[in-house]
Amino acid sequence: MTSARLSIIPEFLEKISLLGYDNIFSVNKSEVVNLKNKSDILFRGIKTSAGNQTASLKSLTGVSNWVLDEAEELIDENIFDTIDLSIREKNIQNRIILVLNPVTKDNWIYERFFEGKGIEAGFNGVKDNVCYIHSTYLDNKENLSESFLERVEAIKHNNYKKYAQKLLGQWLDRAEGVVFESWSIGEFNPDDLQTSCGMDFGF
């Protein structure tokens, strides 16, 4: 759980401090305890290459909210379903929260929650018991450095497709590099160089 200790937990501590709730929570490297109502926030990793971690997550009891950070990196939809079905506390609202940066449209999250439900990129609202919240750097410009915003403008000017995906949260039609881009038609072999031909059968 190195990633949680280095990124998620420090950010959580920062936010509870801003809210003035430092005395309400007890924090260690893998767990946050609310001292008032005794509820826990647990931090766990998902190992997609081995079943042990998923099995241990499935066996967790009393969990009513599950937040999957960097959800686009979870390749196996079956792992999501396994844990999703374990969030089933009675007489309480259960929530599954996916936090992600959109990647390509062949990702199962896009196919299941966007294409499958007729949801356009950038949608904010509720459909079929799913709440969509789309945010970008534009919602937080007042907290971003001038140097960062200058880099963003450079990307926007030089590579709008990258800007749209990385910074506006749009889904890519295909993986980068699959097909050449920014090409033009010109004279073939103007320097009369030796020509060789080959064929890629695609496997």
Describe the function of each predicted region.
Residues 32-36, 120-128, 186-189:
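Short, conserved catalytic or adaptor-binding loops enriched in Gly and charged residues
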Residues 4-64:
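Inter-Walker segment of RecA-like/P-loop motor cores
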Residues 65-66, 97, 196:
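Hydrophobic "anchor" residues on beta-strands that sit immediately upstream
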Residues 140-201:
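ATPase catalytic-site recognition across NTP-hydrolyzing enzymes
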Residues 36, 201-203:
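A generic beta-sheet turn/junction motif
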Residues 69-71:
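Walker B catalytic acidic pair
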Residues 1-4, 92-93:
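Conserved SF1/SF2 helicase motif Ia
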Residues 73-143, 147-156:
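ASCE P-loop NTPase helicase motor core
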